[in-house]
């Protein structure tokens, strides 16, 4: 597998709808000229933004976190330009961008250093071949203080790995009817 460059990312987004909406350059300021956490195409990746839709984890029901029987009541829904994550807690969000991953591509998501240096970790599982949807993002606040996430700004970087022509997967995410195929909005755990 080889990592793909900005040229390839632009081509795939424009000609094949791999990322929408798509920013071909790197945006570092908002429309008023204020500096923001950058998003858009980078040398070997694409920096995604999170939407204004957040689910903030709380333990108001003193429940046990169980991925097989997740209690949706453990979240508070927030729609805002800013999300405040409680100390040692987490929040879910989703990308503004909708992805359509080709069969011969695997996408790895890494957090942006701006957030990591503040103790805010972004976790996303790989975007598998032929998966499509909005990416659900998980932000962990590892600090003992509240932490802030900004909507409509960069939060994570996607790296695109392309398989060699003779090594394309036999079974894609779509082939096996993956449970998160076509997800929109912030998607909670499914079993």
Curated annotation (Swiss-Prot):
CDD domains: trimeric_dUTPase (cd07557). The active site is at 138 (proton donor/acceptor). It is an enzyme of class 3 (hydrolase). It catalyses: dCTP + H2O + H(+) = dUTP + NH4(+). DCTP binds at residues 112-117, 136-138, 157, 173, 183. Disulfide bonds: none annotated. GO terms for biological process: dUMP biosynthetic process; dUTP biosynthetic process; nucleobase-containing small molecule interconversion. Keywords: Hydrolase, Nucleotide metabolism, Nucleotide-binding. Pathway: Pyrimidine metabolism; dUMP biosynthesis; dUMP from dCTP (dUTP route): step 1/2. Catalyzes the deamination of dCTP to dUTP. Homotrimer. Belongs to the dCTP deaminase family. This is dCTP deaminase. It comes from Xylella fastidiosa (strain M12).
């Amino acid at each position: 597998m080889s990592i793909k460059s900005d040229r390839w990312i632009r081509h795939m987004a424009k000609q094949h709808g791999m990322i929408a909406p798509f920013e071909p350059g790197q945006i570092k300021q908002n429309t008023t000229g204020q500096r923001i956490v950058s998003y858009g195409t980078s040398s070997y990746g694409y920096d995604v933004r999170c939407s204004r839709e957040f689910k903030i984890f709380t333990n108001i029901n003193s429940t046990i976190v169980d991925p097989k029987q997740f209690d949706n009541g453990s979240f508070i829904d927030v729609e805002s330009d800013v999300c405040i994550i409680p100390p040692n807690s987490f929040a879910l969000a989703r990308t503004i961008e909708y992805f359509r991953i080709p069969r011969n591509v695997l996408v790895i998501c890494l957090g942006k250093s701006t957030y990591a240096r503040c103790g805010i970790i972004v976790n996303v599982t790989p975007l598998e071949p032929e998966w499509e949807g909005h990416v659900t993002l998980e932000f962990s606040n590892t600090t003992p203080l509240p932490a802030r996430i900004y909507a409509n700004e960069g939060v994570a970087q996607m790296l695109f790995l392309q398989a060699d022509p003779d090594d394309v997967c036999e079974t894609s995410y779509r082939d096996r009817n993956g449970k998160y195929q076509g997800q929109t909005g912030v998607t909670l755990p499914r079993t």
